[in-house]
Swiss-Prot record:
Residue ranges that the UniProt entry lists as topological domain Cytoplasmic: 61-91
Membrane topology term: Single-pass type I membrane protein
Function of the protein: Down-regulates the EGF receptor.
Entry protein name: Early E3B 10.4 kDa protein
Native source organism of the sequence: Human adenovirus B serotype 3
GO CC term (a single one): membrane
Sequence ranges on the Lumenal membrane side: 23-34
Length: 91
């Protein structure tokens, strides 16, 4: 079973981006000054970049987990350690 933290972090990143874009969409450009608009743009850019980085890291962790599971299951059954498998959530 795939650990739940992969799903949570995958869902949190798009949620943050959508919430940020929603907040920006309700901001009126006539009401804010130039500094505030640049600060808002920087905030949106940081949120998007951090979310993309988080998704990439999470993807690499998921791929690593899959390869560890495949390597563990390819071992002969007498060499499989159930404690290690439970710790890594491989079974």
């Amino acid at each position: 079973m795939i650990p739940r933290n992969f799903f949570f972090t995958i869902l949190i990143c798009p949620f943050n981006v959508c919430a940020t874009f929603t907040a920006v969409a309700t901001a009126s450009p006539d009401c804010i000054g130039p500094f505030a608009s640049y600060a808002l743009f920087a905030f949106v850019t940081c949120i998007c970049v951090c979310s993309i980085v988080c998704l990439v890291i999470n993807f690499f962790q998921l791929v690593d987990w899959i390869f560890v599971r495949i390597a563990y299951l390819r071992h002969h059954p007498e060499y499989r350690n159930q404690n290690v498998a439970a710790l890594l959530r491989l079974i």
